Amino acid sequence: MRRTSRAAMLGLAMVLWIGAQGVGIAQTPAPGPVIVIETSKGTITIETYPSEAPKTVENFVKLVKANFYNRQHFHRVEKNFVIQVGDPDSKDLAKKDTWGRRGNGQPIGVAEISKKLTHKKGAVGMAHSGDPAKADSQFYITLAAKKNLDGKYALFGQVTSGMDVVDKIEVGDLIRRMYVK
C-alpha cells in the first residue's frame, strides 16, 4: 500500500512539474534587435521579440534605421498608463495641436497579438485607432501593468533599461535619436 501511495504521489508531482514548465507559465520570448532611444531626459533600451511579432518588429526596425523617430516629440503621456510617440508631425512645434493624429501612413497590415506577451510595466506595443492591423508608426510604452489591453494591441518589446527615464517623460520631450544596437 505504501509503495503504491509513494508511486502515485511521485507520478502526480511529475505531472504537475511538467505542466508548470509550459502551460500557463509566461516565458520571455527569444530576443531580437535591441533599440536604443536617446531622449531629452535620458536613454531607454528596448529588447524586441520578432518571434512573437515578426512583421511589427521588422517595420519598427526599418523606421528606426530610416531615422523616422529622430527629433520627434512624445505627444501622449497619461500617468500610470502610457507614453506614446510616432507621429511625424510632432517634429514641428507649430503643429503641437495636431500631434498624435497620424502615423507614417503605411500600415503593418497584420495584427500580431501574442498570447505570450502581456502589458506589464515597460511593455512596448503598437498604437492604433480601432484596428490593430492598421497600426503603422506610433508606439507606446506602458507605465504600469495594464491587463485590460492584453489581446487588443500588438506587443513587440520590453524596456530593459531606462524605465526611470520612461517614468520622467512628459508631453513635448524630445527623441534625440533612435538606433539599433
What would you call each of these model-derived segments?
Residues R2-R3, L16-K181:
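Cyclophilin-like peptidyl-prolyl cis-trans isomerases
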Residues A7-L16:
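Sec-dependent N-terminal signal peptides
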